[in-house]
């Protein structure tokens, strides 16, 4: 009985001390979003939350919360922290696409030809001062990359170089002519010499890579190496 009496008396005391309207969300201390005067407001501005332009609390759709589409917040327009924005996705430029093609990728529409890496145009002497000077002044108009097929499709270097020179000059001439620039007989003569040297360099590079790949295949396919690899796998698994 004594416990029941104490509990009843405590409830009556709390009812008498219950605050009148004007506490939470009225005139007293408030959460963000209440604009009534009086008391301390958190934050001090009337209306919105931290850096919010249209009222509303944390995460509200029109007051802006963390990452909300309307109003402030991290990375949203109008907030106090709008300088912290998400980085935009990098756009793939034509330079990146051209760089990928320059690594020996197969060129579409050329029947399996590949485009070699860019090279420095060789310094060539043509036997007279006029042609040497003409080449130095016009070498930028000539190709610095060659088209070629894999070396295993040719029986020797001469066949590779002959095909490489023909397709490279043809493609470069067609592409340049469409831009309104024509080549003279002197240009074609110099282009043939330049592209020939570049095709020889490309053949040597591709041949070396081809034989290295072949040597690796032969090495790993030999019986002693296969037995050694099998033994190591057995030790690891076992």
Swiss-Prot record:
Glycosylation sites: 166, 182
Disulfide-linked positions: 164-199
Membrane protein topology class: Lipid-anchor; GPI-anchor
Chief place where the protein resides: membrane
Positions with a binding annotation for Cu(2+) 4: 70-72
Superkingdom, natural source: Eukaryota
GO cellular component: Golgi apparatus; plasma membrane; side of membrane
GO MF entries: copper ion binding
Propeptide: 216-238
Location of the protein in the cell: Cell membrane; Golgi apparatus
Region span, Interaction with GRB2, ERI3 and SYN1: 16-215
Spans annotated as 4 X 8 AA tandem repeats of P-H-G-G-G-W-G-Q: 44-83
UniProt-listed GO biological process terms: protein homooligomerization
Binding-site residues, Cu(2+) 2: 54-56
Coiled coil: none
Quaternary state and interactors: Monomer and homodimer. Has a tendency to aggregate into amyloid fibrils containing a cross-beta spine, formed by a steric zipper of superposed beta-strands. Soluble oligomers may represent an intermediate stage on the path to fibril formation. Copper binding may promote oligomerization. Interacts with GRB2, APP, ERI3/PRNPIP and SYN1. Mislocalized cytosolically exposed PrP interacts with MGRN1; this interaction alters MGRN1 subcellular location and causes lysosomal enlargement. Interacts with KIAA1191.
Function noted in UniProt: Its primary physiological function is unclear. Has cytoprotective activity against internal or environmental stresses. May play a role in neuronal development and synaptic plasticity. May be required for neuronal myelin sheath maintenance. May play a role in iron uptake and iron homeostasis. Soluble oligomers are toxic to cultured neuroblastoma cells and induce apoptosis (in vitro). Association with GPC1 (via its heparan sulfate chains) targets PRNP to lipid rafts. Also provides Cu(2+) or Zn(2+) for the ascorbate-mediated GPC1 deaminase degradation of its heparan sulfate side chains.
Domain note: The normal, monomeric form has a mainly alpha-helical structure. The disease-associated, protease-resistant form forms amyloid fibrils containing a cross-beta spine, formed by a steric zipper of superposed beta-strands. Disease mutations may favor intermolecular contacts via short beta strands, and may thereby trigger oligomerization. Contains an N-terminal region composed of octamer repeats. At low copper concentrations, the sidechains of His residues from three or four repeats contribute to the binding of a single copper ion. Alternatively, a copper ion can be bound by interaction with the sidechain and backbone amide nitrogen of a single His residue. The observed copper binding stoichiometry suggests that two repeat regions cooperate to stabilize the binding of a single copper ion. At higher copper concentrations, each octamer can bind one copper ion by interactions with the His sidechain and Gly backbone atoms.
PANTHER family referenced in this protein's UniProt entry, alphabetically: DOPPEL PRION, MAJOR PRION PROTEIN
Disease linked to the protein: Found in high quantity in the brain of humans and animals infected with degenerative neurological diseases such as kuru, Creutzfeldt-Jakob disease (CJD), Gerstmann-Straussler syndrome (GSS), scrapie, bovine spongiform encephalopathy (BSE), transmissible mink encephalopathy (TME), etc.
Protein name as annotated: Major prion protein
